[in-house]
């Protein structure tokens, strides 16, 4: 009853606490206390940023390590560090029948906690070294993560159906790209673009769609040959949002 009374009292105030990890102040609002009371959990001792870092640390897809295959002993690239203690196999090895995952099974011990045993099981069973299908449905795409159905790609994260793409993140169904962040499909021969779709031979453009040979621009639709422009629709040969004609435009960007 006392504990419930404290929780009920705390649900009506805002409290400032010091994060046990980063030592910075953070605030717990009344609505937060109400939620903790409803879920029957204690109030946090870490600030929101540190809690987010702790949750995200579970998943790694941008740091690669050199490892040895647990079955063949061959060198493999892995998202699991050597210090993790996790045995790894190449994607091709993991999908074969040359190893039996059931051999790693153990009986549940009711005298120990679930998470203690689950952690031990995670570190015992081999995992795919990389989250990609290199050697299966992808070719020459070893240095990729969260990746499928590609060819000749290097350091590409969270992507699929690509060809000749390098140093890019979240790209789908495109080809011949470098330094691209978020492509929603059918992009070709672009460099340093963000949030694009169906763009061709564009450089340094953001939030644009269906554009051709546009440079250093933002929020374009169905435009071609635009330089240092924003918010245009269906325009051609523009410089700083002014139509200048083909001849002058080519002179400007020369």
Task: Give the predicted meaning of each segment.
Residues 1-9:
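N-terminal amphipathic/basic-hydrophobic helices that include classical n-h-c signal peptides
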Residues 11-254:
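Long, distal/terminal scaffolding or interaction modules
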């Amino acid at each position: 009853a006392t504990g419930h009374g404290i929780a009920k009292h705390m649900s009506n105030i805002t409290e400032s606490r010091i994060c046990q990890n980063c030592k910075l102040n953070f605030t717990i609002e009344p609505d937060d206390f109400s939620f903790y009371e409803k879920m029957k959990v204690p109030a946090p001792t870490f600030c929101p940023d540190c809690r987010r870092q702790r949750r995200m640390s579970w998943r790694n897809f941008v740091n690669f390590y050199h490892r040895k295959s647990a079955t063949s002993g061959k060198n493999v690239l892995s998202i699991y560090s050597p210090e993790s203690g996790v045995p790894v196999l190449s994607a091709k090895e993991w999908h074969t029948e040359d190893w039996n995952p059931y051999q790693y099974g153990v009986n549940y011990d009711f005298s120990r906690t679930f998470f203690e045993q689950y952690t031990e099981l995670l570190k015992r069973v081999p995992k795919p070294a990389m989250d990609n299908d290199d050697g299966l449905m992808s070719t020459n795409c070893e240095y990729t993560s969260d990746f499928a159905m590609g060819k000749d790609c290097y350091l590409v994260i969270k992507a699929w159906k690509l060809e000749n793409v390098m140093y890019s993140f979240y790209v789908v169904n495109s080809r011949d790209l470098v330094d691209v962040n978020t492509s929603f499909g059918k992009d070709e021969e672009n460099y340093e673009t963000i949030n694009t779709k169906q763009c061709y031979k564009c450089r340094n453009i953001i939030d644009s769609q269906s554009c051709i040979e546009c440079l250093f621009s933002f929020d374009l639709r169905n435009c071609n040959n635009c330089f240092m422009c924003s918010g245009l629709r269906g325009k051609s040969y523009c410089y700083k949002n002014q139509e200048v004609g083909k001849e002058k435009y080519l002179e400007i960007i020369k």
